[in-house]
Design a protein with these regions (language model features):
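ATPase/helicase motor core of nucleic-acid motors
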Residues: 257, 286, 389-553, 560-563
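Conserved RecA-like helicase ATPase core segment
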Residues: 20, 242-353, 743
Length: 770
């Protein structure tokens, strides 16, 4: 058990331990399994393994080694180390063991699971028949504590609970027993119907995928990919859930493998995905009880090689600010992180302004000076040196803006247009200086101009308004929200067509669309030679006239999301995401017409209802010429020379709607789900509820900003609005040093008033306000 603080070289330790297993223990690479929490982390480990491993093996071959060692090295292929997220390993392991006569398993994205839950999982009928009961049950888990108003909202609220049934290994029979509340019985019946449908159709959601591997391991039917594993190494173990813990224990026991876990309880961020920090804190006892052996450790990695002395001192002080957080950490208390960077002398910077617009403009001035000008010079001369990007290759990609949310627009309320948030103002301010930012999560897919144009062109191609009887989507039983956005997409496409897009390779956009219309409406034309076409072909057929999706990094991420939505339809949609050539175009029962309706209902409607997430991890690296904008969760495991942390641009009043993001008054919805299920998970529930739900909610906020403050290598800057710094402020915010007992560390550390007049602002000595 290795407890690795931020910047302490845990990736290096994992890679060297793998190489030690190969060179010292003579394990073949394919006998070693490493799991990581993100795809990006897996890529980094694989890259280092290849780079360092090949160099070490080449050097070893030049040494006077035994003939047996020489023969061993001749057959070593470092590429065969099994590396990936646990989900990807499960997919590969189960897929490679499939017999030729078995249908392939299809893994569902969360939006597809939500759709199936509504239509095939019994939620639709149960919600209609028991709306009051289910609404009361689900309301504590919604964003605003109100009952879901639509079936889609009910499904999105219920999915995390049903996922937890598997992730937490809940006794669902007891949960839905006759002596439990009626809502419990209804939910357990929905879960049973949903799981049965998935089994009968060879579908798996991600929790079901992991459960399938666990069942194989328990039956000692170890998949071929893992059958010869002799060493298991797990990164970010603090974010493991009970199901994943069971998989690791079963695999280690079945294969008699060595077992190494690396993690940090202070950096656990994924409670909302089922992560259970208590499993890491209690790892030694749980390992002893389950495997009969106590692991070595905990071994502490406390030398920080990433950050300057000032940054390490800042995040060390932050994590110890609230004494109520102490009992939530590994006991006995672990050593304090020590700086080993050898650089420093730049204090923690703080930029606070009256409003987010002014802040965006001033921050853009700062960024431009650092990366496009001669460097940032403090007007008052408080910095020893100017701050400037690397002279050889420095660019905007060396900086990142981190925030709990990176959305650029607030949600619209009561029919009013949405208000711009800080990130939107920053995008515009940077664009005015000919600088760009990379924030694919900042805007909903349905609202992005180029996405609107593409989806509008798609609708005009397969469901044009001149169809006899009008377009299909306008009369379908889909939500008014979906119809609103589809109408908007069509209008955007029509406006785009008026610009007369240039031909591509001698072919016009009008020709491409006309061929799809001929096929979909009448079953004629060049495309009629095929009985059916994948819907993806329509999307990619239109891309040449919208080169934004090919050349812009954000556009590439958006195109992947659209493609994923279309591809997922193959797993659950009536026509598997394909357009069928019509045989009787005028008939409402024609398969061509029905296949178009299936595409509209199962692909375009989820996009219009904003339930498709982007996945920027498809980008092998972030663009060097853009300012990265990430949620703190996304930045886990990454590092940047300059890190700007938004600690409260949204919080200009003490509004109750945003308190859960800064100073919760009640347990988070995730903590309440944990408390709900605790009585039905005897092992996990007792461990988890040693701390109450409100305490756990505060812990999550402290860990979130601890991770943010420990990302920078050279410079950390906090940004926010002035109102939060007023001496008399009631805008309590964990990120600004507020403790759970409502005392304020930043105010305590500021020069104290000597007379009746109070200072206007707090001014903690460890911050340099610019």
């Amino acid at each position: 058990m290795i407890v690795a603080g931020p910047g302490s070289g845990k990736t290096t330790v994992l890679v060297l331990r793998v190489l030690r297993h190969i060179l010292v223990d003579h394990l073949r690479p394919e006998q070693i399994l490493i799991t990581t929490f993100t795809v990006k982390a897996a890529r980094e480990i694989r890259s280092r393994l290849i780079e360092w491993g090949e160099a070490l093996f080449e050097q070893a071959r030049t040494e006077p080694i035994s003939q047996a060692d020489r023969e061993f090295l001749a057959h070593v292929d470092i590429n065969r180390v099994v590396t990936g997220t646990l989900d990807s390993v499960c997919q590969e392991a189960l897929g490679s063991d499939r017999h030729a006569d078995e249908p392939p398993l299809v893994t569902l994205e969360s939006f597809a699971a939500s759709v199936i839950l509504q239509r095939r999982g019994g939620l639709g009928a149960s919600y209609r028949n028991n709306q009051a009961v289910l609404g009361a049950f689900l309301s504590p888990f919604t964003l605003d504590d109100d009952p879901p108003t639509t079936l889609a909202e009910a499904a999105n609220t219920l999915v995390p609970i049903i996922d937890r049934f598997i992730q937490d290994r809940v006794d669902v029979v007891s949960f839905g027993a006759a002596d439990q509340p009626e809502a419990h019985r209804i939910v357990s019946e929905i879960d049973a119907t949903y799981r049965r449908y998935l089994r009968e159709n060879n579908l798996l959601d991600f929790s079901g995928l992991e459960e399938a591997l666990l069942e194989r391991l328990r039956a000692r039917l170890v998949p071929i990919l893992l059958a010869d594993v002799r060493a298991v190494l797990v990164d970010e173990y603090q974010d493991t859930n009970a199901l994943q813990e069971a998989i690791y224990f079963e695999l280690v026991e079945a294969c008699q493998a060595s077992f190494t876990v690396v993690g940090d309880d202070d950096q656990s961020l994924y409670r909302f995905r089922g992560a259970t920090i208590e499993l890491f804190r209690a790892f030694i006892d749980r390992c002893r009880n389950r495997l009969g052996r106590a692991p070595a450790g905990p071994l502490y990695l406390v030398e920080n090689y990433r950050s300057t002395d000032e940054i390490v001192a800042f995040f060390n002080a932050f994590v110890r600010t609230d004494p109520n957080f102490g009992p939530a950490r590994i006991q006995p208390p672990k050593p304090v992180i020590r700086p080993n960077n050898g650089q420093g002398q730049v204090p923690i910077l703080a930029m606070f302004r009256p409003d987010s617009q002014t802040l965006a403009n001033d921050l853009t001035d700062f960024i431009e000076a650092v990366f496009r000008g001669g460097g940032y010079r403090d007007p008052q001369g408080r910095l020893i040196d100017d701050l400037r990007g690397n002279a050889q290759a420095g660019d905007l990609g060396d900086a990142v803006l981190l925030a709990s949310s990176v959305l650029e627009m607030q949600k619209p309320y009561f029919g009013n247009p949405p208000k711009a948030r800080f990130t939107h103002h920053l995008r515009n301010a940077m664009a005015a200086r000919d600088m760009k930012m990379f924030n694919p999560r900042g805007r909903s897919l349905r609202d992005i101009e180029h996405v609107e144009q593409l989806l509008g062109l798609v609708l005009l191609s397969i469901d044009p308004p001149d169809r006899p009887g009008g377009s299909l989507y306008s009369s379908m039983a889909i939500t008014n929200v979906a119809k609103f956005f589809m109408n908007r997409w069509v209008a955007a496409a029509q406006q785009f067509l008026q610009t007369n897009p240039r031909p591509v390779y001698g072919r016009t956009l009008a020709q491409e669309m006309s061929e799809w219309r001929d096929y979909c409406l009448r079953g004629i034309g060049d495309k009629a030679s095929s009985r059916d076409w994948p819907f993806l072909d329509v999307i990619y057929g239109l891309i040449p006239w919208l080169d934004y999706f090919e050349i812009d990094p954000e556009g590439q991420v958006y195109l992947e999301a659209l493609s994923r939505a279309a591809g997922q339809a193959a797993g659950f949609s009536a026509y598997r995401g394909r357009l069928i050539r019509p045989q009787n175009p005028g008939s409402p029962d024609d398969h061509g017409r029905l296949s178009i309706e299936a595409i509209i209902r199962d692909v375009l409607t989820p996009l219009a209802e904003n339930v498709i997430d982007v996945d920027e991890e498809i980008m092998p690296s972030v663009p060097r010429d853009r300012l990265n904008v990430m949620t703190i969760h996304q930045a886990k495991g990454l590092e940047f020379p300059l890190v700007i942390v938004d600690v409260g641009t949204d919080f200009t009043t003490n509004h109750q709607k945003n308190r859960f993001r800064r100073f919760p008054e009640q347990p988070s919805s995730t903590a309440m789900i944990e408390d709900l299920l605790a009585p039905f998970t005897p092992d996990l529930g007792a461990l988890r509820t040693q701390r109450n739900g409100l305490d756990r909610s505060f812990e999550d906020l402290i860990r979130l900003y601890y991770v943010a403050f420990s990302r920078p290598q050279s410079v950390l800057m906090l940004v926010g609005c002035d109102k939060a710094l007023k001496w008399t402020s009631n805008i309590k915010n964990v990120a600004l040093g507020w403790r759970q007992d409502e005392s304020w560390a930043w105010r305590d550390q500021s020069p104290q008033p000597t007379g009746r007049r109070l200072p206007v602002m707090v001014s903690p000595p460890n911050l340099l306000f610019v």
